[in-house]
């Protein structure tokens, strides 16, 4: 009887310990084509972008989410201050045009104030998308320095992942993100990459 009672307590304690483990309750915040952020109306309006992000994070907190997956590199450009890649046209209206704030730094600060982890989402290979053209790439885009790292499929351009130079460059992009920003994870997503 004593043994059964102690076993029952042990099992109950184990169940409670599983119940208290945090769940990943997240949402994705897409920036390509201004799907979620910033809105098309807020392109280049940085105070409006900040207000919109704060409103989103407040809503996520009310929904009891504990993480966001924020797309910071949709088309080989950056929604953060980068020395490797140009500012995103989805943020500023023109690729390479500098924003007056660092959206990723802002998101990290505001999300963490609300107990929300920040996972960054990058599309490692896509260079053009959403109707973008190679001619529209900023002068400081790596394409202009190393066109041999890229390939065209249909109307879209991509990094050529079979090249060591491409992989080395992408590793630098990731290293830059993890060393300069207070982020919890990186998600690499390229379901857009062409395949036969």
Predicted regions, residues:
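Sec-dependent N-terminal signal peptides
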Residues: 4-13
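N-terminal structural segment of carbohydrate-active enzymes
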Residues: 20-78, 167
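Glycine-rich, aromatic-flanked loop segments that form ligand/cofactor-binding clefts
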Residues: 21-26, 65-76, 103-151, 185-190
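Active-site-adjacent "subsite" loops/lids of carbohydrate-active enzymes
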Residues: 30-50, 120, 125-180
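An active-site-proximal structural segment forming one wall of the substrate-binding cleft
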Residues: 56-65, 107-110, 158-191
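Aromatic-lined carbohydrate-binding/catalytic grooves of carbohydrate-active enzymes
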Residues: 63-99
């Amino acid at each position: 009887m004593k043994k059964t009672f102690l076993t029952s307590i042990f099992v109950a304690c184990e169940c409670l310990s599983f119940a208290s483990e945090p769940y990943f309750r997240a949402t994705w915040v897409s920036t390509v084509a201004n799907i979620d952020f910033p809105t098309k109306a807020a392109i280049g309006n940085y105070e409006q972008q900040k207000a919109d992000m704060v409103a989103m994070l407040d809503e996520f907190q009310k929904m009891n989410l504990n993480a966001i997956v924020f797309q910071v590199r949709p088309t080989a450009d950056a929604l953060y201050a980068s020395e490797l890649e140009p500012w995103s046209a989805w943020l500023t209206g023109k690729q390479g045009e500098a924003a007056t704030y660092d959206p990723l730094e802002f998101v990290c600060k505001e999300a963490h104030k609300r107990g929300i982890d920040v996972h960054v989402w990058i599309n490692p290979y896509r260079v053009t998308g959403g109707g973008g053209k190679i001619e529209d790439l900023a002068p400081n885009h790596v394409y202009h320095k190393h066109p041999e790292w890229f390939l065209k499929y249909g109307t879209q351009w991509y990094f050529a992942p079979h090249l060591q130079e491409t992989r080395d460059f992408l590793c630098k992009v990731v290293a830059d993100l993890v060393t300069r920003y207070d982020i919890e994870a990186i998600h690499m997503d390229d379901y857009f990459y062409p395949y036969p």
